[in-house]
Regions:
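Substrate-engagement module of ASCE P-loop NTPases
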Residues: 159-166, 194-221
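Extended alpha-helical interface modules used as scaffolds for assembling large macromolecular complexes
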Residues: 243-244, 306-548, 554-556, 585-591
């Protein structure tokens, strides 16, 4: 007889839920879940028709999925399994598992204006049929057959609401990425008139939302809607006066994304599962400039900042699966893909060529001001305040307090900074200015490893002059600084720190070496950029050089610089432009 021998089952570290949007899968697959369930209490006490806008890849879909599982009457039997170890499982609210759930995900709806009605109808038909199947015991008999005799999402939703009322069934309606296809429509030129027809008056999309509103009088008890921008929300819900937009509410500032404490807790856990090569503080120091610094409520400014949750998970996943080494690339390629989707919409800042261009102004002075709008119609998207707000909702800028009675916005982190500078360079390319990628990359490598700086800055100067010669209005110090900064931001070996980031002075650009990624690079740089008008004398150029020489030596002693250069050789470079011609590019010695 063979005796059973007890064996211990190996316990693996919790999975990292990078890219996962299904709450049930996250829990059942033993993933690390940052507990956002305390917000359920606040959501339940809030208006029953809840609108919430956040940038892409900020955890909206997973949060929506968590709420879906929490309120679904069919999942009452697994409530303890899913939520027992979380805050809300130990402090359940009265409404948990009390609703029939309809979930719509507009991200998979065909985004073409001419076909979107069919796409919406097809998506809703599938969702409504699923609803009828899984909740059959709570619904009148024959509801599915009756619904399928009707054409279109509007008629079918209206029918479902009437039928559900007969059995007193209460529905929680979730709509994820409600604005997915309308954002794409708006990005297309000459589509604004067609878009307006669909979102106003008797337009189909407007009628669909009106049907939801009508359903709230009978069977739709709660609605939770997520999206990326408030544009469509404003167009669709004027008159939908039962809903509340909680996007800018301080109490929901931390609903999605991660606080620094949440990031630290996650790192602490994985440090017990893997042999980290860095301390927690060191990893936070590496991650913070790239992923942190979002603020979505003015009252939260100075109190808490939010990390992009997707990027944090990307970093930790790559770190623990790469022998606990910092990833070679700090930016997830999926983020770049999402940026490209937004790019056409951002191009509504069509006055780029003008010095007052909002994005160019943001790059040049490192901030912009404006009034943060909770919503605005698409036809007013070109209004400066509305465009600034659009950049905020897309995550391209974030709240940095107030300035002269207006909200002050800054670029939140290096991930976004690179995206914005990529946008600028792409715009230059569209204006017949091409950049040889191989040549640029070779120059960047030689800058970092060989200390060959002159050719690198000459390449930037040649590119700048070529573009400016085609655009007479592109003149002035702001343009020169913005162009140079955009070019240096494309250098993979450095994180450019510009202007106000150095507290002891205003070094135009400190090329901070990314030694955590490229540990063998040997050179770092401070670039003091000066500008003279075309008519200025040589004596004035000499005076600018003397000023720059003093300044760059002083800046080299700042804590930001001394703590970052480490083993690299620090070069102090003075670059002076006279108009759009670089007339000085010299290294200065210590004084």
């Amino acid at each position: 007889m063979v005796e059973n021998q007890s064996t211990s089952i190996r316990k693996y570290p919790k999975r990292i839920p990078y890219g996962m949007m299904n709450f049930k899968a996250v829990i059942e697959d033993d993933c690390y879940y940052v507990d956002k369930t305390p917000f359920v209490e606040k959501i339940e006490r809030a208006n029953k028709f809840f609108f919430y806008i956040r940038p892409r890849r900020f955890g909206k879909s997973l949060t929506l999925s968590m709420l879906e599982h929490y309120y679904d009457i069919n999942r009452a039997n697994i409530f303890d399994k899913l939520f027992g170890h979380l805050y809300i499982g130990q402090h359940p609210t009265p409404e948990h598992n009390k609703y029939l759930v309809i979930k719509l995900n507009f991200a998979i709806v065909n985004a073409e204006l001419n076909d979107y009605k069919k796409g919406l109808d097809d998506h809703c038909r599938i969702a409504f049929n699923f609803f009828c199947d899984v909740y059959a015991q709570y619904l009148p008999k024959g509801i599915k057959e009756g619904m399928n005799q009707l054409d279109g999402a509007v008629k079918q939703l209206n029918f479902l609401c009437r039928e559900c009322e007969k059995t007193n069934a209460k529905v929680f309606l979730f709509i994820d990425e409600y604005d997915h296809f309308t954002n794409k429509i708006l990005a297309e030129p000459n589509c604004l008139d067609k878009y307006r027809k669909e979102t106003h008056g008797e337009g189909y999309l407007r009628t669909f939302f009106d049907t939801i509103k009508a359903g709230t009088d009978s069977t739709i008890a709660r609605v939770f809607v997520t999206g990326v921008s408030p544009v469509t929300l404003d167009d669709l819900t004027s008159g939908f006066n039962i809903g509340t937009n909680y996007t800018l509410s301080a109490q929901f500032n931390e609903l999605t994304g991660f606080t620094e404490k949440e990031v630290r807790d996650m790192l602490e856990y994985y440090s017990t599962q893997y042999e980290f090569n860095h301390t927690i503080d060191e990893l936070i120091t590496i991650m913070k400039p790239w992923y942190d610094n979002y603020c979505f409520a003015l009252k939260k400014y100075g109190k808490v900042t939010m990390y992009n949750s997707n990027m944090v998970l990307y970093f930790i996943d790559n770190y623990v699966n790469n022998d606990c080494e910092v990833p070679d690339h700090m930016i997830d390629e999926n983020i770049r893909t999402d940026y490209n989707k937004l790019r056409m919409l951002i191009r509504r800042d069509k006055e780029f060529a003008h010095d007052a261009s909002i994005i160019q102004q943001l790059v040049q002075q490192d901030y912009i001001t404006g009034e943060l709008k909770s919503g605005f119609p698409a036809e007013l998207i070109g209004n400066p305040d509305n465009f600034v707000s659009l950049l905020f909702y897309f995550g391209m800028v974030t709240i940095d307090g107030t300035l002269e009675g207006k909200t002050k916005f800054i670029i939140p982190n290096e991930v976004v900074r690179e995206q914005l500078f990529t946008y600028l360079l792409d715009t230059y390319k569209e204006n017949d200015l091409s950049f040889d990628s191989y040549e640029k990359n070779e120059l960047a490598s030689h800058l970092a490893y060989r200390g060959e700086w002159k050719a690198y800055f000459q390449y930037i100067a040649d590119s700048l002059h070529k573009y400016a010669s085609q655009r007479d209005h592109q003149k002035g110090e702001y343009f020169v600084h913005g162009f140079t900064l955009a070019m240096t931001c494309q250098n993979q070996y450095y994180r450019p720190i510009s202007e106000k980031d150095t507290q002891e002075g205003y070094a135009d650009i400190f090329l901070c070496p990314l030694l955590d990624i490229y540990s063998d690079m040997t050179h770092s740089y401070i670039v003091e950029l000066k500008y003279a008008k075309s008519k200025d004398t040589d004596a004035h150029i000499q005076q600018l050089f003397k000023e720059a020489e003093v300044q760059v030596n002083r800046y080299a002693q700042s804590e930001v610089v001394t703590s970052a250069v480490k083993t690299t050789q620090l070069h102090k470079i003075v670059v002076i432009y006279k108009g759009t011609e670089m007339v000085v590019c010299e290294e200065v010695n210590n004084q």
